[in-house]
Amino acid sequence: MVHAAEKLRRQRQRAAALTIYTRTSPFAPGFYSQAASTQLDLPSNDTAVLLEAARPLVARIFRPHRPLAKAGVLMQHLQSHDILQTHLMVPMSEEQQQKRECLMQTIDRINRRYGRGTLQWAGCGLQPSWLMRREQLSRAATTRLQDLPVVKA
């Protein structure tokens, strides 16, 4: 969720809805797949707002003692960061929203400068018990300059 929020801010987008999904291996006995969605009161790219919205969704679909093969988040109904339609029941004033945006930009800047995860959200845990396997990661020649093939004549 944290990386999805960072990506939204980097692309100058806000999400008005989000979906959380999980599934076990389809090849293992007791296959399980589930998803849950929610609409946000206001479109947002604020990590704290998105984590708060995701928490009840995860609680609803998570099944303990089931090894997950895949889990993810979908940000939906994306809107430009420059356009924000507000309404009367806004939980934050415009000044508070600007302060939150400044905080998110500062956190992103620190994490870019000192490495991803330098500043973390407490709810995400300090030491994850697992890490994504990346030993067979495909090259991303279309999206990363470092992965472009070098041709020598």
List each language-model region with its residue ranges.
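Basic, low-complexity intrinsically disordered segments
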Residues: 1-153
